[in-house]
Amino acid sequence: MKIFLWLAVFLCLGSAHSCKKENIQPLLLVSVEASGVDLNNTAIRVAVSTPIKATFTTSIDPLSVSATSVLMTRDYDHAAVSLVLIVSGTQLSIKPAVNLVSGAVYTLTITPELKSTHGDPFGSFAIGFKTTGVFVPPNQVAYWNFESTPPDDVVGTYDPTSTDVVDIAYAISKNDSSGRAASFNGTTSLIQMANGSALLKPEFTISFWMKLNSVGHVDSNGNLKGSFVLGIGNTHGLQFDVDPNYAWCRFSQGLLLGDSITKVANDFQFFANGATKDNIQTNADSLAAHGIDNATVFNQDFGSAGLKQRLDNVWANITMTFEDSTKSRTLYINGEKMYQQNLSLLDNPNVSPALRPLATVTSLVLVPDTEIPARYDDKLVFGFWQNKESTFGGAAGSYINPDANHFQGLLDDIRIFNRALSDTEVSLMYEGGK
């Protein structure tokens, strides 16, 4: 009789335990949404600061929520995104610690390390989504979109006021979503603002859209004029200009050398016919003959066609990066690498002694004028290579001379970063902005 009673109790307890387990719901995903829209069912662009809310069938164990159970990665460089994760019963709030990059693709992954309060593991889940806006990589410190009057910097901490805006008109930009562009007349148009040299850093990127107009862009003798597109202190800081025949384009730069004292002006000049191609030489005679071109590691070759079809009266995206850690500087046109130098390669006994110190470069910088009174200052200028009060370069470089190489055309979306962007970032930024 006792045996029967104990067996009955045992079966009852076992049955109760079995029934209890059957009532436990597995941890399944019900929905994942941003701003009330289910990402699982709708292709949507997510705002860069919007939290994502995941809802499950049963309560989540807060101790199972971690950087390995809930992950977000940026697709273009596979960078992990730091997340703020908050559990409330069956809901999980997933919020980036800092705003996501606009116009970028991300992947959200939830792994079996996530568990319910009963210890049941989640299966697995991954979903991709794209953020709103045009792709703009991190570390942007200044941006001019020319939508406001005066056309001030609208991003970052640089924030100067455009103190001189001379003969600037506005025109429709490169596409419907780009608003307006600044139009320069080729003789007097200019925008300038103070303290441009503050933007020159050991890690640096400048990117802008331009539409050069060569029609009627001639001097008083009928000769074609080149184009000073923008600048900080002419060749002594940073300036970009284009040859009148489109044989070359150039970023002149001021460079701070490794002793932290010496500052020199140097040209980063892309010859589109491949004139500097394959100039990393192995014998002493060639090294001595090629000078700065010994630093060339990549050079597109467009032959006699030059740059005309890429730059003349068409919208073109120009990007230049400088990277102290690799001693490299790179020019891109329309997201494609055109020209690259590695200045550390100048550290060679067969290279001219005058050029070897460039191998120690540490930063872009404004080379100060040693003459009194100074012939230029550190204003950032759009439409010319130096501020309009400057006297450097004589008549040919003077703003007041209508025969000088004033820029004629349109400018838009000028961006500056305190980081050297990668090839992928430059390409994505071009694709997003075109």
Name each model-derived stretch.
Residues 142-145, 206-212, 318, 414-415:
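Short hydrophobic/aromatic patches on beta-strands that form ligand-binding or substrate-lining surfaces
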Residues 22-137:
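Acidic, low-complexity Ser/Thr/Gly/Pro-rich repeat segments typical of extracellular/periplasmic
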Residues 208, 313-323, 329-331:
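Short tryptophan-centered beta-strand motifs in secreted/extracellular beta-sheet-rich domains
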